[in-house]
């Protein structure tokens, strides 16, 4: 962990902000907010803001710890070589301390300001990503994304629990939806950046099992994801606005996955089907969870 580029201080606020992986944090904040808004019951706006802020800060802390640990790996990958640590714009101690400060502070404030059950789940999600996934799973098994996907699946559960104070079937389903969504989302990316992973010795699925196996698994997870997203509708946890949206969104997801999963040879097309699936998978999750909130609003207003 000591071969990252030499230090080039001072690091400015943009480097610290980059450590939090703001693009990833956007999705984390959004799904956490959707879990909070879709939950039954009411919550004071200040407490709601505190909950979402803590989710965001906790995710940022976990991301900073991830980059602290993986600085050498990031230096060897084209996609990540310009991050603050491998680019030499920040020292590792600063990144580590920043990550621990964000992580610890977010859990403490969540516990005092929102509730300790939400704080415990937040703490576990940070530990899950920064240790279980980053340190233990990612360098050891091609199933790292499958098992490690739980780290990114907690925000809607935390948002829901911030309102209700307990864990019921619905927040568990929201967790499972993101858990099942993660492999096809990330493996689509891994297919077109697999040479980077191979170069630094990370056993991502395309590197270890090959493209053909990865494509089959992308299709399998996408097919399983579709009925899972409909379960909230079937059990009455969400209404028709969400249900029909989930069905249409899921069918498009499967259709794009079929194009990726059934490809036996890859022509010189820049892996466009894989890139389309990856791009759509991000849009899919935003719209799916957005429609969950829209469904809740329609129910409250008596529109369904």
Curated annotation (Swiss-Prot):
It catalyses: heme b + (2E,6E)-farnesyl diphosphate + H2O = Fe(II)-heme o + diphosphate. This is Protoheme IX farnesyltransferase. Gene3D superfamilies: UbiA prenyltransferase. Pathway: Porphyrin-containing compound metabolism; heme O biosynthesis; heme O from protoheme: step 1/1. GO terms for biological process: heme O biosynthetic process. The keyword DNA damage does not apply. Disulfide bonds: none annotated. GO terms for molecular function: protoheme IX farnesyltransferase activity. Keywords: Cell inner membrane, Cell membrane, Heme biosynthesis, Membrane, Transferase, Transmembrane, Transmembrane helix. Converts heme B (protoheme IX) to heme O by substitution of the vinyl group on carbon 2 of heme B porphyrin ring with a hydroxyethyl farnesyl side group. It comes from Novosphingobium aromaticivorans (strain ATCC 700278 / DSM 12444 / CCUG 56034 / CIP 105152 / NBRC 16084 / F199). The lineage of its organism: Bacteria, Pseudomonadati, Pseudomonadota, Alphaproteobacteria, Sphingomonadales. The chain crosses the membrane at residues 24-44, 45-65, 107-127, 145-165, 172-192, 234-254, 277-297. GO terms for cellular component: plasma membrane. It holds the Pfam family UbiA. It is a multi-pass membrane protein. It is found in: Cell inner membrane.
